[in-house]
Curated annotation (Swiss-Prot):
An example Gene Ontology CC term for this record: peptidoglycan-based cell wall
Upper lineage: Bacteria, Bacillati, Actinomycetota, Actinomycetes, Mycobacteriales
GO biological process: response to host immune response
Coiled coil spans: none
InterPro entries tied to this protein: PPE_C (IPR022171), PPE_dom (IPR000030), PPE_sf (IPR038332)
Superkingdom of this protein's organism: Bacteria
Ranges that cross the membrane: none
Family membership noted in the UniProt record: Belongs to the mycobacterial PPE family.
Pfam families in the record: PPE (PF00823), PPE-SVP (PF12484)
Name of the protein: Uncharacterized PPE family protein PPE19
Length: 396
């Protein structure tokens, strides 16, 4: 405990007047009264329900066990309610002790006034004339010191007594068996084991009896025949589906084989075609070379390339085409066969038409010359008509 007598009145008075007061203690006492009232009501209701069940339709060992488990809980609620009520009363005692100590404590302004008066007396005590007044002031201050200390000691003693009267609260007792779940699990496991053992003991004689009887067959032909009867109606559609799949597979294989054969033929044809094209190209080159050589020799023998003359500003005409002078002279040697026909219309037509298919080109020497180019001229000339029907004069 704090030695309040060693503390000056300024400290004790300041602590008492600066605190929250007794209002918090009074509020706490009211709350404890409410808790006590609720516990008393709960205990009374619980007790009435238990007695109503056990004295009515529920009678037996289970009812007795329920009463034995519920009675401690009812007693605990009643005891706890009494403790809460006692706590409320003791809190009120502490609040009353505070109020008493507060009333006995010297107010801080009085103590401050006493100290201020002492300072004035000491300051004006030049010749010692204030000595008696200073002594009286110090005596009053001592009385204040003693009064505050007594008030604090009394408040502390009363609060300690009220606290010591309180009893510690206990936890609520268990109204169920904590090992009940474990015992239930053990009982269930034992029941399962017992049932399995009983079933095993019942099956052993039956198995021995079956072994004692002669076995008919190791294969269950009856069951297999029933199974075959159930499956056989479904085998025909399955076989049809399998046949269809086989047909599709065969068709696919045929197509693959045809494609493979075509691929092989193409692989064999490609080199042969390439060889044929290469051979034809070589033959064409050789033919053109031979034709060029023959043409050159014919031109050389006929003298076409021997002399070249040029005349500035003048050219011969073959029809509407301007040609060199040599071409015009050569063109006169070509005489169309149509001019020898006895018909006048044909003759006039032959005179107005060009001499031959090449439109007056200078091929006279080429056709009349006996050189090696005559074969080419004969090849380019149209074959003679086997028969020409004469025009009848009566037809106009």
């Amino acid at each position: 405990m704090v030695d309040f007598g060693a503390l000056p009145p300024e400290i004790n008075s300041a602590r008492m007047y600066a605190g929250p007061g007794s209002a918090s203690l009074v509020a706490a006492a009211k709350m404890w009264d409410s808790v006590a009232s609720d516990l008393f009501s709960a205990a009374s209701a619980f007790q009435s329900v238990v007695w109503g069940l056990t004295t009515g339709s529920w009678i037996g060992s289970s009812a007795g066990l329920m009463v034995a488990a519920a009675s401690p809980y009812v007693a605990w609620m009643s005891v706890t309610a009494g403790q809460a009520e006692l706590t409320a009363a003791q809190v009120r005692v502490a609040a009353a002790a505070y109020e008493t100590a507060y009333g006995l404590t010297v107010p801080p302004p009085v103590i401050a006034e006493n100290r201020a008066e002492l300072m004035i007396l000491i300051a004006t005590n030049l010749l010692g004339q204030n000595t008696p007044a200073i002594a009286v002031n110090e005596a009053e201050y001592g009385e204040m010191w003693a009064q505050d200390a007594a008030a604090m000691f009394g408040y502390a003693a009363t609060a300690a007594t009220a606290t010591e009267a309180l009893l510690p609260f206990e936890d609520a007792p268990l109204i169920t068996n904590p090992g009940g779940l474990l015992e239930q699990a053990v009982a269930v496991e034992e029941a399962i084991d017992t049932a399995a053992a009983n079933q095993l003991m019942n099956n052993v004689p039956q198995a021995l009896q079956q072994l004692a009887q002669p076995t008919k067959s190791i294969w269950p032909f009856d069951q297999l025949s029933e199974l075959w009867k159930a499956i056989s109606p479904h085998l025909s559609p399955l076989s049809n589906i399998v046949s269809m799949l086989n047909n599709h597979v065969s068709m696919t294989n045929s197509g693959v084989s045809m494609a493979s054969t075509l691929h092989s033929m193409l692989k064999g044809f490609a080199p042969a075609a390439a060889q044929a094209v290469e051979t034809a190209a070589q033959n064409g080159v050789q033919a053109m070379s031979s034709l060029g050589s023959q043409l050159g020799s014919s031109l050389g023998s006929s003298g076409l390339g021997a002399g070249v003359a040029a005349n500035l500003g003048r050219a011969a005409s073959v029809g509407s085409l301007s040609v060199p002078q040599a071409w015009a002279a050569a063109n006169q040697a070509v005489t169309p066969a149509a001019r020898a026909l006895p018909l006048t219309s044909l003759t006039s037509a032959a005179q107005t038409a060009p001499g031959h298919m090449l439109g007056g080109l200078p091929l006279g020497q080429l056709t009349n010359s006996g050189g090696g180019f005559g074969g080419v001229s004969n090849a380019l000339r149209m074959p003679p008509r086997a028969y020409v029907m004469p025009r009848v004069p009566a037809a106009g």
